[in-house]
């Protein structure tokens, strides 16, 4: 099935110094890890057809009695809660699921707790086998993903690519129609690759048939519908499930701050892609006026229901008015909290948010997560905005729902409304930062560090073909033993870039540990007007951040684009990854894995640019690191060391009357070239 490409965080040994960077550990799996890895993949194989997936395990699941084995779980109350819900009826198999419906969330949460509190992996596996047979497929997949990410005994166990598990969230309905009929009608061209027969289906993105003159947002369809980007967003929200209390499940205490900053990075990356397509800043919107961007998905759910659409410049439906009244009240309370500096907690006491943990508190109440100081008073403007802008009808009953794209994490970023929601939310972030005391020059200028030079290789982007195997997400007949195994693959073009290096020379007056940050931002706006500094620094996007040891004198550093701290390469297809597991189990061949399970798609590090070269600028910042630093640990992103400064430093609080000119900081003009496919064989 798949394995992430090895990313070594290494800065080269060059002329004047040895420069060491922090890196993600790579481990060699022992047999226990391999067996767990194999079983997890089998738990997520053909979830809609468990008896066809493995009849032995299907029978084992049916034989497992949770109530009779209540002592096999570490939390009897959680088991009783689940059994009570199950006996009163849960979401039937085949029905649609979304976290944004309280009853469905309650059921899924109870199932997750059942998985989480299994006393060992064997009990967890048996419980999951039972649930695979009896629980709604989407509830099962989501709760199992969350449990594997959270349980102590499944740390860094890889999960199947979500776009293989749930292709209906990633590909157009006409493509999946062909996939479902590929074997029945035999109309698709096939090819033989190794031991498999492959069916290749070319695919467009949604809206390929629309007139772009009237729907300019469609220029960005290759970006907002990228399967790697949408899978990244799913895992971003899995890092801190909004319904999960941090203390109860030992989650880090910066979830609110990470929620805000990670969405700020996504928004800035999106903005750079807008510039590459000559689109302006996002417009403001009013809850009492028509909403500009339309959304016309050509996707259907696995049960055949279409994703809801939203016409361009449409008035809000009457059945959304109750949510509009509520969100306007909640937004006014959050604005008042930022302006006053105080929020009201559950005990009716005022709490100062201009404190060390203040931004984290603010992020929690905006998201409305389980750590919010006062969910009743501040609600969740994140959830309410999705409810309103999704334009889906109200549920006919608690189990008859048609979620909008905004109510499914892996489809949220496809809707242009997503970016309007988070522009509004990130405006609160900027407002909070502007209310804080700005940095003084002594906090960001370090004369003992001087950047002598900063260059970067030629930056070239292009579109490439990518094949996705989707067998696991389709209903398929049992294959005859004499048939050659077949794979159904969807082929799409995706944005990528040629690898490149940053070349940095730093002069240090003494040996020290330092932190290097690299940001990319616009040079001009969509009207070709030079951006303003520091006002427009809020649009800069952090692409790298690492610590290293500097020697006294000149230090020459080379940093490759593959090393950027939060990126990773594409995942291997499931059939390849699974074969590696079995090979290692049946031989002496080692199986290695990274201590992380996902990252931002490295392909999308750079905006598309233009054929003639599009101007952007890099901002390089170097600062000393004290003996103390932050050890960032994530079950999804891995472990990494950062200095103790805030996310986005030093651009998070712009310093006015200062052009960010100093010995330890530097702006660098760059051009990003986009090459057509037929140009890629030409040497430049």
Swiss-Prot record:
Domain Hemocyanin C-terminal, first and last residues per copy: 438-674
Induction per the UniProt record: In 5th instar larvae induced by juvenile hormone. In adult workers induced by a protein-rich diet.
Signal peptide: 1-21
Gene Ontology molecular functions: nutrient reservoir activity
Hemocyanin N-terminal domain mapped to chain residues: 33-155
Keyword Cytoplasm: yes
Additional facts recorded: Hexamerins are evolutionarily related to hemocyanins but do not bind copper and have lost the ability to bind oxygen.
Record's protein name: Hexamerin 70a
Source organism (scientific name): Apis mellifera
């Amino acid at each position: 099935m798949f394995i992430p490409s090895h990313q070594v965080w290494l800065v080269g040994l060059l002329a004047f110094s040895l420069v060491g960077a922090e890196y993600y550990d790579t481990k060699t799996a022992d047999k226990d890890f391999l067996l767990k890895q194999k079983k997890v993949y089998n738990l997520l194989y053909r979830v809609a057809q468990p008896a066809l997936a493995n009849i032995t395990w299907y029978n084992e699941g049916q034989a497992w009695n949770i109530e009779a084995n209540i002592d096999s779980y570490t939390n009897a109350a959680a088991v009783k809660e689940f059994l009570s819900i199950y006996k009163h009826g849960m979401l039937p198999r085949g029905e649609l699921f979304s976290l944004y419906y309280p009853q469905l969330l309650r059921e899924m949460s109870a199932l997750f707790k059942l998985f989480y509190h299994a006393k060992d992996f064997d009990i967890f596996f048996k419980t999951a086998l039972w649930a695979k047979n009896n629980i709604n497929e989407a509830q099962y997949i989501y709760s199992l993903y969350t449990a594997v990410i959270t349980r102590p005994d499944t740390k860094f166990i890889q999960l199947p690519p979500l776009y293989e598990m749930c292709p209906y969230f990633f590909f157009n309905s006409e493509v999946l129609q062909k996939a479902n009929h590929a074997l029945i009608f035999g109309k698709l061209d096939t090819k033989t690759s190794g031991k498999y027969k492959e069916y290749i289906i070319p695919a467009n993105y949604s809206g390929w048939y629309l007139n772009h003159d009237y729907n300019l947002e469609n220029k960005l369809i290759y970006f907002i519908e990228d399967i790697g980007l949408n899978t990244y967003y799913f895992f971003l929200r899995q890092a801190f499930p909004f319904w999960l209390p941090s203390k109860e499940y030992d989650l880090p205490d910066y979830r609110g701050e990470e929620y805000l900053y990670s969405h700020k990075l996504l928004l800035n990356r999106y903005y750079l892609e807008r510039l590459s397509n000559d689109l302006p800043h996002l417009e403001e919107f009013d809850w009492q006026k028509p909403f500009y961007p339309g959304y016309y998905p050509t996707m259907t759910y696995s049960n055949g229901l279409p994703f809801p659409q939203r016409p361009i410049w449409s008035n809000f439906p009457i059945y959304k008015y109750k949510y509009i009244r509520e969100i306007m009240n909640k937004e006014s309370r959050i604005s008042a909290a930022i302006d006053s500096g105080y929020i009201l907690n559950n005990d009716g006491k005022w709490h100062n948010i201009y404190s060390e943990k203040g931004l984290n508190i603010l992020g929690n109440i905006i998201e409305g997560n389980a750590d919010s100081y006062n969910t009743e008073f501040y609600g969740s403007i994140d959830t309410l905005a999705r409810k309103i802008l999704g334009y889906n009808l109200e549920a006919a009953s608690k189990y008859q729902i048609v979620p909008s794209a905004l109510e499914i994490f892996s489809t949220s970023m496809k809707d242009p409304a997503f970016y309007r929601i988070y522009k509004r939310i990130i405006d609160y972030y900027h407002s909070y930062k502007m209310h804080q005391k700005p940095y003084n020059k002594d906090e960001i200028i370090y004369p003992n560090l001087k950047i002598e030079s900063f260059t970067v290789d030629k930056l070239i982007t292009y579109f490439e073909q990518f094949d996705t195997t989707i067998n696991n997400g389709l209903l398929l007949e049992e294959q005859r033993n004499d048939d050659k195994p077949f794979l159904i693959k969807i082929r799409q073009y995706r944005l990528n870039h040629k690898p490149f290096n940053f070349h940095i020379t730093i002069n240090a007056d003494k040996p020290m540990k330092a932190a290097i940050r690299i940001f990319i931002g616009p040079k001009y706006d969509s009207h070709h007007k030079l951006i303003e500094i520091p006002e427009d620094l809020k649009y800069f996007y952090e692409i790298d951040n690492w610590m290293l040891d500097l020697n006294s004198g000149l230090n020459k550093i080379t940093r490759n684009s593959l090393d950027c701290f939060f990126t990773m390469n594409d995942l291997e297809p499931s059939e390849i990854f699974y074969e590696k597991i079995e090979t290692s189990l049946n031989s002496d061949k080692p199986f290695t894995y990274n201590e992380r399970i996902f990252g931002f798609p490295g392909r999308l590090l750079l905006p598309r640019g233009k054929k003639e070269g599009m101007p952007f600028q890099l901002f390089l910042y170097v600062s000393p690191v004290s003996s103390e630093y932050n050890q960032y640990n994530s079950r999804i992103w891995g472990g990494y060391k950062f200095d103790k400064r805030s996310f986005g430093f030093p651009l998070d609080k712009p310093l006015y009357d200062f052009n960010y000119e100093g010995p330890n900081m530097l702006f660098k003009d760059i051009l990003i070239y986009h090459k057509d496919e037929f140009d890629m064989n030409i040497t430049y």
